[in-house]
Curated annotation (Swiss-Prot):
SUPFAM superfamilies: Actin-like ATPase domain (SSF53067), Heat shock protein 70kD (HSP70), C-terminal subdomain (SSF100934), Heat shock protein 70kD (HSP70), peptide-binding domain (SSF100920). Acts as a chaperone. The modification Phosphothreonine is found at residue 198. Gene3D superfamilies: 1.20.1270.10, 3.30.420.40, Actin, Chain A, domain 4 (3.90.640.10), Substrate Binding Domain Of DNAk, Chain A, domain 1 (2.60.34.10). This is Chaperone protein DnaK. Residues 599-635 are annotated as: Disordered. Residues 601-612 have a biased composition (Low complexity). Induction: By stress conditions e.g. heat shock. It comes from the Bacteria. The keyword Cell inner membrane does not apply. Belongs to the heat shock protein 70 family. GO terms for molecular function: ATP binding; ATP-dependent protein folding chaperone; unfolded protein binding. Residues 620-635 have a biased composition (Basic and acidic residues).
Amino acid sequence: MGKIIGIDLGTTNSCVAIMEHGKPVVIQNSEGGRTTPSIVAYTNKGERLVGQVAKNQMVTNPENTIYSIKRFMGRRFEEVASEIKMVPYKIEKGLNGDARVNISNIKKQMSPPEISAATLTKMKETAEAYLGEKVTEAVITVPAYFNDAQRQATKDAGKIAGLEVKRIVNEPTAAALAYGIEKKHEEIVAVYDLGGGTFDISILELGDGVFEVKSTNGDTHLGGDNFDDEIIKHLISEFKKESAIDLSNDKMALQRLKEAAEKAKIELSGAQEASINLPFITADANGPKHLQYTLTRAKFEQMVDHLVQKTKEPCLKAIKDAGLKASDINEVILVGGSTRIPAIQKIVKDIFGQDPNKGVNPDEAVAIGAAIQGGILTGETKDMVLLDVTPLSLGIETLGGVMTKLIERNTTIPTKKSQVFSTAADNQTSVDIKVLQGEREMAAQNRILGNFILDGIPAAPRGVPQIEVSFDIDANGIVHVSAKDMGTGKEQKIRIESSSGLSESEIDRMVKDAEAHAEEDKKLKENIEAKNTANSLIYQTEKSLKEYSEKISIEDKETIENKIKELKESLEKEDISLIKSKTEELQKASYKIAEMMYKDSSQQNASNQQENGTQNNTSEEGKEADYEVVDEDKK
């Protein structure tokens, strides 16, 4: 079995790690960073950029630079109204009702898994460059509170990137693995995970290599992006008061504000105030306008207090669901860059009655845990067992629009539960089974994961047919449902694919597109190299021609000048095969200059040797004469 890499596919940043000699190692990317921005961009030439290079051009290309795509994974268009307001790129409704991104530079609508696949491909290539071998398998992490559709979308993204996703692991659980890999004693740990776009809290029991999740809770609409958004709204409001100009509809200005807000938020974790200076943010009839503002930590904490408080309720629920008191928890581990905010650390202390443990790197712990899980699957990491839970209850819609739960939230997975139901009307020959996920009592208030029909039921009075419905959740937290007519033995099975999810044919198309992109990237690199070689040759040849023009024949000089002209013309035409052939022709023609250079060099060397020989002889004679004179004196 080859290496299984561990990937933290984050809202803001992603990270990849691997097990080496029994230890997890975080791998640096090609730019030297240990984390990679989860940003994908398309230039006006249709070139795809991923990571830091994509982030570098965000301000000038806001509508074609996609960040925080994780907020749209596995979600229907009508579910993302608040998220749409937070991004400058265009979100549209897909044919199957899901949220998709319209990228104007390539005139294409793309699904969130397809965009996430570009980041996963970057992580895959980072690992391959480090290992020097092909990577095909991965463990990918997701927020603990991700529903089935969001998990399936993450798995689809892996497939599009050419990865077999061996396991989907909850982020807090992965962080606990990173924390507890060398711990031998038993303890109860809370993992408070506030990332760029999601919040999770998980309570785990650690002991003898067993990592058992007791409960989990969270909010998939709360993260560092929301904190940035509060700063942006405040800056827009202050600027409007000062200059009577509203920046909220200026996409380029918003992108600059986004960058400045994120920078200020980070600064305020270590300083009492942050200066925000954005020259030429906009202009009016009187000329350019500049934004200058000093944001204090006190003001920032006042602005985001409602967000900080939103993390409290999920924590209290998780403690209660685990059957514990806050005082029973031995350690609180902080994960995610947003946990560096002092106000967050304060509320954690208030909730749990203790200072949080800062021994785990909040940016790398999740990827490290994913790599450890990869090691468990390959057998490289021994004596460790991970027992995770399903974050939300699962059930079906029954008579009266009620949700009947078959699997309660926080049930250890993998698990299987069955229950017998019957028909609601006389002579009913089929049943429509709606699969639901959520905690509300009525079906309409929960998320429909999917539905299927079991038909061929023999006509009978209502309540007579016996229909067994079984729910099976695998280790990835993905749901499989079956319904069986006990009388006839007829059975219908489905793996739940969200109504907003991708079909197999769509995934296959996206895999092919991703492979084509890899080919395009390779071709683009070759094209750039061919142009660079041509330009370099033109420069060197022109330089040499100037130096040796008097030493080569007029005929050779004209040939070389013509070949330079032809190569320059081919560069303007952007025809790579022509550029390559004209480069070769110029190389051959320029051999005449090389001959002259070599001849010149040989003559120079011969001349130098002759001069050196004369000098050496003179020197030797001088030495001898001196010696003789000295000798004579002595005599």
